[in-house]
């Protein structure tokens, strides 16, 4: 019997990352209201948000592994999710340019069969290029940063403005593949168990 692998996220980037691993997940968006959670510790916040998203979906299914994720970028001790407007995105990029930040991705993996749950956090240091105002405005006008935690997509146009990473590359895209492999192993699975 094949165990369903369910991604509790509407993120196309997370789905694509799983597909590169050989996992074609069932996608179930949780529609969880993130504003319900108010925590100041970034790691606790991304893990709690990931857990809540996974739990919403887990309560809707009878079996399978459910993966929830949430990402935030911290720059100068301030945490950022998706910008709410183009103006906010421009202001963030003016703070980010020539600076570095830490991208945190919370991972929650729920195993309905074993009634187990794991929480982990991937952490990656991101170094941004010293981009011009014209580059910032053009990038924001593309619409891409408005769809991304941290206001940039490493796998898209935003990759042009990232000079260096320290840590897991896929974590910055929204899902640490090495961390997921470790979590699967801890639950007694291998990645190959979910290959299509």
Swiss-Prot record:
Its cofactor is a divalent metal cation. InterPro entries: ITPase-like_fam (IPR029001), Maf-like (IPR003697). The lineage of its organism: Bacteria, Bacillati, Cyanobacteriota, Cyanophyceae, Oscillatoriophycideae. GO terms for biological process: nucleotide metabolic process. Belongs to the Maf family. GO terms for cellular component: cytoplasm. The active site is at residue 70. Nucleoside triphosphate pyrophosphatase. May have a dual role in cell division arrest and in preventing the incorporation of modified nucleotides into cellular nucleic acids. This is Nucleoside triphosphate pyrophosphatase.
């Amino acid at each position: 019997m094949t165990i369903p692998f369910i991604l509790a996220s509407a993120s196309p980037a997370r789905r694509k990352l799983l597909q590169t691993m050989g996992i074609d997940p069932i996608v179930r968006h949780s529609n969880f209201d993130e504003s319900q959670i108010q925590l100041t510790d970034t790691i606790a916040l991304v893990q709690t948000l990931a857990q809540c998203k996974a739990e919403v979906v887990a309560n809707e299914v009878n079996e399978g592994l459910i993966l929830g994720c949430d990402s935030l970028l911290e720059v100068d001790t301030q945490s950022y999710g998706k910008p709410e407007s183009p103006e906010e995105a421009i202001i963030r990029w003016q703070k980010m340019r020539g600076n570095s930040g830490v991208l945190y991705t919370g991972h929650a993996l729920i195993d309905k069969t074993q009634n187990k749950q794991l929480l982990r956090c991937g952490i990656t240091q991101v170094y941004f290029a010293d981009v011009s105002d014209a580059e910032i405005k053009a990038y924001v006008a593309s619409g891409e940063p408005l769809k991304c935690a941290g206001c940039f997509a490493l796998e898209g146009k935003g990759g042009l403005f990232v000079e260096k990473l320290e840590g897991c590359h896929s974590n910055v895209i929204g899902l640490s593949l090495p961390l997921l492999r470790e979590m699967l192993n801890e639950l007694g699975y291998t990645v190959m168990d979910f290959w299509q």
